[in-house]
């Protein structure tokens, strides 16, 4: 048997219950709304074009023809260069992903030139010295099907 009185001495005394004021529910609701307003938004903005602080801003008065792609590498508009045209090579995956999404949306909207615009844009993002990759032996073989415990209906 243990020493019951020593056990009682080590425990902290119980706190008395505090009375809740009448407007406590209002205060709880306000703190809940504050929590919602402080929460960071879920949307994220991804910059595709690199921002170089050392280069000057593009001239506002000069007109650039974006459809032909003539002004993208010009010194007049240094911040308007496309991906991969700067001094450092950056990953191009976000740009290609956005272009493919845009291409998938255009036929639904009724754009007649949607099929024509994609190959021209894709050729701009490829490096001039590299040829398109040949399909390797791993890509030629069909993918192995996943064996599921239940048959698919």
Swiss-Prot record:
Region listing for Disordered, in residue ranges: 1-24, 65-94, 125-153
Stored Pfam families: Bclt (PF15318)
Superkingdom of origin: Eukaryota
Low complexity bias spans: 67-78
Biased composition (Basic residues): 1-15, 144-153
Annotated S-S bridges: none
Tissue expression remark: Preferentially expressed in the testis.
Name of the featured protein: Uncharacterized protein C20orf144
